[in-house]
Amino acid sequence: LLYCLFISELCDMLSSNDFNSSLAFSLDQYKKHDLVKADSIDLMNRVDSKFLFRLSELPKILEECVSSYSALQMLKTCVFAYKNTYFDFPDYHLYLSHHNKKLNRNKVRFRTYPKTETKFLEVKTKTNKGRTVKARIKIPIENKVIGEENAIFIAEQGITNPKTLVPMQMCNYKRISMMDYGASERLTFDFHLHYNCRYENSNERFDKEANFELGDFVIAELKQNKL
């Protein structure tokens, strides 16, 4: 049994190394842009299109996009860690609105960029026109719950009783971010997604047993001003 486990782990490691090599080769073919260039595209009011595919297909898909996009690069890497904490009301109102595909629905989250040690409070609204409108402010990296200033900002986005929002889910993942040469759209690839859900009536505790991952899938998102 131990031998079988060792062989299984060895195969997983070799497979991971092959994937990382293929991914690095695909990304090396891209022209690169920096964060200043990426931020020059104003897509805070946009149309989103999402796609799901197998992680093993990512290197090939990247190779097919190289003629149309450049890749964000910082500190000599094009693959970045993201950490999101999603907030909701105790009755899961925000989640249920999303699940039931209601329009004029919201998401509230903290987004942390470990590479640059920065953190933002973000409110995303899906309008009745099918557009995504995002508003965000920079917050201290140590913030974990909705404070007074955060609550004011959230209320300004049309969400009532923001002080009753509590963290419900944590999500960690890797992202590759692209922009087209016309500087009119972004394309992101999220993978190695890990989720951890909150339990009990606590602002800080997350259930280590209630976690799951989408290790074999990639979520691609195309962000455009219009279709």
Give residue spans per PLM region.
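Phosphate-end processing signature that detects enzymes handling 5′-triphosphorylated RNA
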Residues: 2-227
